[in-house]
Amino acid sequence: MSLERAVRAKIASKRNPEMDKEAQEWIEAIIAEKFPAGQSYEDVLKDGQVLCKLINVLSPNAVPKVNSSGGQFKFMENINNFQKALKEYGVPDIDVFQTVDLYEKKDIANVTNTIFALGRATYKHADFKGPFLGPKPADECKRDFTEEQLKAGQTIVGLQAGSNKGATQAGQNLGAGRKILLGK
């Protein structure tokens, strides 16, 4: 198998149809429109118009001009504008897909992961009341301990690995018992 074919097979194996469906249903719920029947998930997203509608619902006027015609470069501009708006909305840069992942269908799983990252980012916007996608991100819960509390913690046997009962060697026998005979 050629290297290129192996890479394509690996990328295709990352794709989860259930996640694609969940992302599609979430997008449809947010923009209040169904995807056209008979078109695949990636084909609907390819021109970037649906993605721009999505971010404009979540963050009004995030993408002021959505290109509905004009060819490949205008559609790629839609995708780039969507990506820029994602970062401004709070999606980490590491979670944002590359334009070719969608437009050339190189890594649709990465596109779906970006949509899930956007779904997680909606939790951080108190004004968003719509349906959420993905798990709620954890909030930082910083603790401040006094020196006395830290010293007291050093004397306690940690129970992270289970119980500290039976932590002695009493009753442990391995192999035959040893007899020490003196004077023979």
UniProtKB/Swiss-Prot annotation:
* GO biological process entries: actin filament organization; myoblast fusion; regulation of myoblast fusion
Whose protein is this, by species? Drosophila melanogaster
Name of the featured protein = Muscle-specific protein 20
Name of the gene this protein is made from = Mp20
GO molecular function terms noted in the UniProt entry: actin filament binding
Under the heading InterPro entries, the entry gives: Calponin-like (IPR050606), Calponin_repeat (IPR000557), CH_dom (IPR001715), CH_dom_sf (IPR036872), SM22_calponin (IPR003096)
Residue ranges of every copy of the Calponin-homology (CH) domain listed in the record: 17-122
Q: Which tissue types show expression of this protein? A: Found in synchronous muscle; not found in asynchronous indirect flight muscle.
Can you tell which superkingdom this protein's organism belongs to? Eukaryota
Q: Where are the Calponin-like repeats?
A: 157-181
Matching Pfam families: Calponin, CH
* Keyword annotations: Muscle protein
Q: Name one GO cellular component term.
A: actin cytoskeleton
Homology family: Belongs to the calponin family.
